[in-house]
């Protein structure tokens, strides 16, 4: 679901390099960023026709923002997409996705929604160039109608999907799919024609993967890992605003159309709300591995003034796997402590733990590569964050712990830790084992390189640590 109330301000902040070892960041506002790489350039496309590009995933340039005539992506958007906007009773567009098909053209899957109901339409616009201009090819799906839906059955908003939040992808065998949906009847997947990008015939809304009964689950994104041979379905739970408890989760399957399971082996098709109840979060919050929610690394007496850092309601992510370097990236928008509804794009590196589940680096990506570390480098004091499993607007604040030289964890939590191989991390806290990695990365707030860890349990809880 997209932010309708916020006029997405271009929030540019440049952190200039004061030495060759200091990364340079330029921040942009693109809500619900969907990533595509073209000619060594990364592009993100988001709600309200916002877009940006970057060569390094750190320094971004804003390309567009606002559903207004003159937007470089669709210059005459109010006329070009008038049918979609009329149907959805909206003056803006929600999260799109862009993919390049075999004809070399770029296909934008756009959508609009009324917002207080699933009255939505989704269509395709095509361009010869990634930066546009895009020309409309027509609507492919509608939802929220009073009568029969696109599948010929009476539209029931608790059962049928809200046709927004598309992610279009090729599977490992070259078949084209679209996963989509927000709240309402859940997350669905459709097979697409790889030549035209349009849905294959006789599918209706496609196959349901999870959700329903107005469960607050949306923003699906699929990533295949040749390393594990799994399809990873990323999802956002909760509400997108600063008080909504937005958080990022993941499930996996051997097949693009499921069935999907979480890290406990629970079937994601059961992740749904209670019939007759609206937004019954406790019914589905136990499902899906939670990668990240609202958090804050708290200041200590030794920190620079106001160096505490954190995110509020991070979510609606996309992801990218670099088959040359073997690196994974998580791209998402987030709000920030004390900054209201202002949002920016962030990129964090991801890693697969020994169980084949993604874990997310605690700090934003700054060009780091994982290395070989020693126990001596790792031992010391850390700011520790437990992301938990619930859907909550509460901020998970860091607590002090120490990884002692003899393999113990002391402080706010107690347990043991060990380093295996070059960088594999294993932490045991209260009898629960968390698997992940150690990683040296840039702490933007402190202005220095620090050792970190990221790990997750079979119960789907993620832990972070950042050395103090």
Predicted regions mapped to residue ranges:
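Carbohydrate-active catalytic/glycan-binding domains of CAZyme proteins
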Residues: 18-468
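Low-complexity intrinsically disordered segments
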Residues: 2, 12-13, 448-451
